[in-house]
Design a protein with these regions (language model features):
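N-terminal periplasmic accessory domains that precede
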Residues: 35-47
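Outer-membrane beta-barrel porins/channels
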Residues: 3-24, 28, 32, 50, ...
Length: 274
């Protein structure tokens, strides 16, 4: 999409959580003791145990590495404080001149250092905020920005409904690569999850990029479903309609995305490693 190509720091759109990645790449409503989920919604930090360390790694594409780390601290019964880092290293790339002749190589990387705070506002309702400092290096060029994520989560434990609203990457650049300041990858999301009492199944639906009114409605939608084999083991999959649409080759009735948009995963939570 043109809007994404015109924004900076698009690594912030990538899921830190392997769980969220398995469910279509976007999920802001899962209530679990998983610190990586609070990168998607700061209100979910309240579900993370005290003194929890989180680490994640993804080989995003050839030569590119994406990593996340966090530490969570409970502040009494209602508040939670966490610190986190998101880091993307794009590796070494060719540097060419105007005639496409290679004249050398350069490295590119981006990092966001974050502080996360969540607080129980009312019964079943939690609010959260993430403050982040972002810096990017492309060869000899550097830019910096500040941003904020705002999140709300309402969770009804008896019926296992979870509903969230998140506004991500509100802010702007404080230092541009050159003279022109870039735009932040602002994203407003709404999501819902439901766990069924009679079946060990949880389903999720998340609407993303709601500030982009020119998208077809279906391209805002991410769907996910999980089978909860136990309190510690899940197997799930998801479908990202927008990704499937963008990866479709051709515009005929027989055009195919060749499986793009589908995602799958599984997870196990080992108590002794918490």
């Amino acid at each position: 999409r043109a809007q994404e190509s015109q924004t900076e720091y698009n690594f912030l759109r990538l899921p830190v959580s392997a769980h969220a990645a398995a469910l279509g790449g976007e999920n802001i409503t899962i209530i679990e003791d998983d610190p990586s989920l609070m990168f998607s919604n700061p209100a979910l930090a309240s579900s993370v145990s005290d003194k929890t360390v989180g680490l994640s790694y993804m080989n995003y594409m050839r030569g590119a590495h994406y990593m996340g780390a966090s530490y969570t601290k409970a502040l009494g019964e209602k508040a939670t404080l966490a610190g986190g880092v998101q880091y993307m290293n794009y590796g070494k790339m060719k540097e060419v001149d105007a005639n496409n002749v290679q004249i050398g190589t350069f490295n590119a990387s981006e990092i966001a250092v974050e502080g996360i705070f969540s607080y129980e506002l009312a019964r079943n309702l939690v609010g959260g905020i993430t403050a982040k400092f972002i810096t990017s290096y492309i060869g000899n060029y550097n830019s910096m920005a500040v941003g904020v994520d705002l999140g709300l989560n309402w969770f009804e434990p008896e019926r296992q409904w979870s509903v969230s609203l998140v506004a991500k990457n509100l802010g702007g650049q404080i230092k541009a690569y050159e003279e022109e300041y870039g735009k932040m990858p602002i994203d407003v999301q709404v999501g819902v999850s439901k766990t069924f009492a009679a079946l060990p199944v949880r389903v999720s639906a998340t609407l993303v990029d709601l500030t982009h009114y020119d998208y077809r409605f279906i391209n805002h939608l991410n769907l996910g479903a999980e089978v909860l084999l136990s309190e510690s083991i899940w197997v799930g999959g998801g479908y990202n309609f927008r990704k499937a649409d963008e990866m479709t080759i051709g515009k005929t009735e027989n055009a195919s995305a060749h499986g793009a948009g589908f995602s799958f995963g599984a997870g196990i939570n080992l108590e002794q490693f918490k």
